[in-house]
Amino acid sequence: RVSDNPVWVNGFHRWMLGLSAQWMQFHPDTNNANRANSINRANSVAPLLVSSRQGLGKSTFCRLLMPDALKAYYTESYDLSSPASAEAKLAAYGLINLDEFDKLSASKMPLLKNLMQASALNIRKAYKRSASALPRIASFIGTSNREDLLVDRTGSRRFLCVSLEHAIDCTTPVEYEQLYAQLKAE
């Protein structure tokens, strides 16, 4: 749907495996062997769909990754000006779309990178004295209309960028049961 580039196809597949593993790591149906392998890892890579042309379906594609039953666990609202709130969303959402990724300020990139690799969350809820350990279930994806969005001299290994050459097919229905069953089996 997005690109035939082998680097994208392989990288996006691995990211989807990480996304589904993160969702299942604390699920009661997950066997202990799989849980042990995934519990200390975070899906620390984020695909970025990039095109200077608007209307290619970047944001729509991101929304389509979530089946209707899980739409409440998808957000495009992610504010890095409040680190505690940003961290709490890692336990509250399954997929966070960094829509218009290029609008994030360079000063917020270290915080974003730290949050992307965080696997253990200790969050203090309002009116509580101590923090609670919560599972990290969120994965990140992003979109941008600018091709020059990654300017970090230390590298950008956390982002899998694809430059769109055509509109994304967002009209063909996603077979969610088949998609997520296959990811779970892998």
Please name every model-derived segment.
Residues 1-91:
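P-loop NTPase catalytic core of nucleic-acid-dependent motor ATPases
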Residues 28, 37, 42-45, 72-77, ...:
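Feature primarily recognizes SF3-like P-loop helicase cores of small DNA viruses
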